[in-house]
Amino acid sequence: MGRVVLTVTLLSSSFSLSSGKTVGSVISDFDAEIFSKTIAASVNGVSVDLSYRLDCDANIEPILLESEAGIEILRHDCAHVMAQAVQELYPETKLGIGPVIDDGFYYDFSTPIAFSDSDFEKIEEKIREIIQRNYRIIREEWSRDDAVSFFQKKGEKYKVELISRIPPEEKISIYKQGDFIDLCRGPHAPSTGWLKHFKLLKVSTAYWLGDAKSDSLQRIYGTAWATKDGLEAYLSFLHEAKKRDHRAIGKTMELFHLQEEAQGQVFWHENGFILYRVLENYIRNKLKTHGYREVKTPLVYNKCLWERSGHWSKFKENMFVIRSDDGEFSLKPMNCPAHIEVYKQSLKSYRDLPLRLAEFGMCHRNEASGALHGLMRVRGFVQDDAHIFCTPQQICDETIAFCGLLKEVYRDLGFTEVEVRFSDRPEVRLGNDETWDKAEIALKSAMDKAGLIYTLNPGEGAFYGPKIEFVLVDALKRKWQCGTLQVDFVLPERLDATYIDHEGKKQHPVMLHRAILGTFERFLGILIEHYDGKFPLWLAPTQVAVLTITEKVEEYAKSLLNHLSKTGIRAVSDFSNQRIDYKIRYHTTRRVPILWIIGRIEEKSNSVTVRRMGSSESEVKTVDTALGDILREFNVR
């Protein structure tokens, strides 16, 4: 087939050229400086290697190395180079998958070698060696039979399984670098020499494709960056995040613990439960002032309720099922069907709507043991759950009211940066287009009226309705999706919830699923790390520690402790015979915001020496002044 003349658009310039030229050569001829920074390219919206040959009119956008897309490609390259390094060091190793993840990558390996962090130096040295070899990274498309035959001969059973999962109409592509060959869609950099700044981070176990019934593999995580500064900044971030790990802080502050006999469930200690209750009561009071009615529903239900709601067929694998002589039951994984049952206990008129039912409901989900992580991923959890039953016309006003409530809560809890995402109708959905149109218009209108700036997640709505997601940005600039509001036309109809409209006809209400925190456990984990355990005074489990310099002032110190407690301040005492510098260090480590230090001088002058967390300075104040300072701060959020 002869060459044809193509029209190409590159960086707002259009020109003609012959087909068959590589994308890289086109960019190089156009601007050599830009080409030197380009790792791959987008051709008509599809990311390709620079070796890709043009065969049709094209809009070309260079993917620069330091761009978000460029760094993602670099990390994918590093995953391949790491896999090559591991196989060169340990030839018996077989390969699983090696995708890019947030800020890094991983690769799963099947090997008799038990990897540990101590192996990283050797693997990293081999990676640097492969980078120095500067292998060209070459893409080839193989027939399905050839690909299967090749990987079968190498004993790469996981690659063979991956090929079997590729749709028949999709091409099978592989990438070569030296003698190393891997199954991959790409794109990749032109050569391994593009990699310079990387670090292996940790190793863990993982099931093949996340299936607990499949093989157990070893997963090595790493990160790669376009610049040395980028890598160093990220490693510094990881160091700070490790210091803030809620599991370590939880142990230091005696907040909670976890143990094997109750996997994924939390043992709250006194300090942790105080923190939990303070947060719960704060949310409870907010809900009360915003017109919510608190309910409490059972923990265990017969499967017939879940069959009617649709959860039994779609969610059973994630439910804890109990079998008895009376049939099959389940611990509830969510509260929504139970709230509909509460709603149905009396006849409702349109005048009774909106009805807002809230519950701090204990739920259980059978999460894979490998997915459990401290408070962030548990099996037993409490949701700050509420469901608003309303008419279609009330969706907008209820959404505005909820957004206002959510902003108040996040502000009070110290989160000033919140991202909002709007997810509209997915391809597979229930309900007709007219109903979806009304719901999406109502939600968008509400967000506009509430002054929310949001991004669109096309097609990411729930199958039963569109949704809004609220993403918190913490002190380390990490993002946590916590709040949500979801419109549901389906469940009220499935469970036959109705109201009488103004024409006397039965209608099904719209159900708004909404949460602010998500789950208490996860949100408390986020809070601990956000504040590094150094909570604002109103949240702190212990607000004041009264420390004595000498046992001779113990009676005076006890009277101060009693005074604090009567005022409603959470205070503890330390009258031990330890040195005062030890006491100060101990209670500072436990993140107590305020220390009252008591000696003979303070006793004689009816005063206290006040030391605030984070300060090496102390200040002598009268008891009334010191107490007044606490009360003023305590009442400010």
From Swiss-Prot:
<feature type="domain" description="TGS">
    <location>
        <begin position="1"/>
        <end position="64"/>
    </location>
</feature>
<dbReference type="InterPro" id="IPR036621">
    <property type="entry name" value="Anticodon-bd_dom_sf"/>
</dbReference>
<comment type="similarity">
    <text>Belongs to the class-II aminoacyl-tRNA synthetase family.</text>
</comment>
<dbReference type="Pfam" id="PF03129">
    <property type="entry name" value="HGTP_anticodon"/>
</dbReference>
<keyword id="KW-0067">ATP-binding</keyword>
<keyword id="KW-0694">RNA-binding</keyword>
<dbReference type="InterPro" id="IPR012947">
    <property type="entry name" value="tRNA_SAD"/>
</dbReference>
<keyword id="KW-0030">Aminoacyl-tRNA synthetase</keyword>
<comment type="function">
    <text>Catalyzes the attachment of threonine to tRNA(Thr) in a two-step reaction: L-threonine is first activated by ATP to form Thr-AMP and then transferred to the acceptor end of tRNA(Thr). Also edits incorrectly charged L-seryl-tRNA(Thr).</text>
</comment>
<feature type="region of interest" description="Catalytic">
    <location>
        <begin position="245"/>
        <end position="536"/>
    </location>
</feature>
<dbReference type="InterPro" id="IPR002320">
    <property type="entry name" value="Thr-tRNA-ligase_IIa"/>
</dbReference>
<keyword id="KW-0547">Nucleotide-binding</keyword>
<dbReference type="InterPro" id="IPR047246">
    <property type="entry name" value="ThrRS_anticodon"/>
</dbReference>
<dbReference type="Pfam" id="PF00587">
    <property type="entry name" value="tRNA-synt_2b"/>
</dbReference>
<keyword id="KW-0820">tRNA-binding</keyword>
<feature type="binding site">
    <location>
        <position position="513"/>
    </location>
    <ligand>
        <name>Zn(2+)</name>
    </ligand>
</feature>
<dbReference type="GO" id="GO:0006435">
    <property type="term" value="P:threonyl-tRNA aminoacylation"/>
</dbReference>
<dbReference type="InterPro" id="IPR002314">
    <property type="entry name" value="aa-tRNA-synt_IIb"/>
</dbReference>
<comment type="subunit">
    <text>Homodimer.</text>
</comment>
<dbReference type="InterPro" id="IPR004095">
    <property type="entry name" value="TGS"/>
</dbReference>
<dbReference type="GO" id="GO:0005524">
    <property type="term" value="F:ATP binding"/>
</dbReference>
<keyword id="KW-0479">Metal-binding</keyword>
<dbReference type="GO" id="GO:0005737">
    <property type="term" value="C:cytoplasm"/>
</dbReference>
<dbReference type="InterPro" id="IPR045864">
    <property type="entry name" value="aa-tRNA-synth_II/BPL/LPL"/>
</dbReference>
<dbReference type="InterPro" id="IPR018163">
    <property type="entry name" value="Thr/Ala-tRNA-synth_IIc_edit"/>
</dbReference>
<keyword id="KW-0436">Ligase</keyword>
<feature type="binding site">
    <location>
        <position position="336"/>
    </location>
    <ligand>
        <name>Zn(2+)</name>
    </ligand>
</feature>
<dbReference type="Pfam" id="PF07973">
    <property type="entry name" value="tRNA_SAD"/>
</dbReference>
<keyword id="KW-0648">Protein biosynthesis</keyword>
<dbReference type="GO" id="GO:0004829">
    <property type="term" value="F:threonine-tRNA ligase activity"/>
</dbReference>
<dbReference type="GO" id="GO:0046872">
    <property type="term" value="F:metal ion binding"/>
</dbReference>
<keyword id="KW-0862">Zinc</keyword>
<keyword id="KW-0963">Cytoplasm</keyword>
<dbReference type="InterPro" id="IPR006195">
    <property type="entry name" value="aa-tRNA-synth_II"/>
</dbReference>
<dbReference type="InterPro" id="IPR033728">
    <property type="entry name" value="ThrRS_core"/>
</dbReference>
<dbReference type="InterPro" id="IPR004154">
    <property type="entry name" value="Anticodon-bd"/>
</dbReference>
<feature type="binding site">
    <location>
        <position position="387"/>
    </location>
    <ligand>
        <name>Zn(2+)</name>
    </ligand>
</feature>
<dbReference type="GO" id="GO:0000049">
    <property type="term" value="F:tRNA binding"/>
</dbReference>
<protein>
    <recommendedName>
        <fullName>Threonine--tRNA ligase</fullName>
        <ecNumber>6.1.1.3</ecNumber>
    </recommendedName>
</protein>
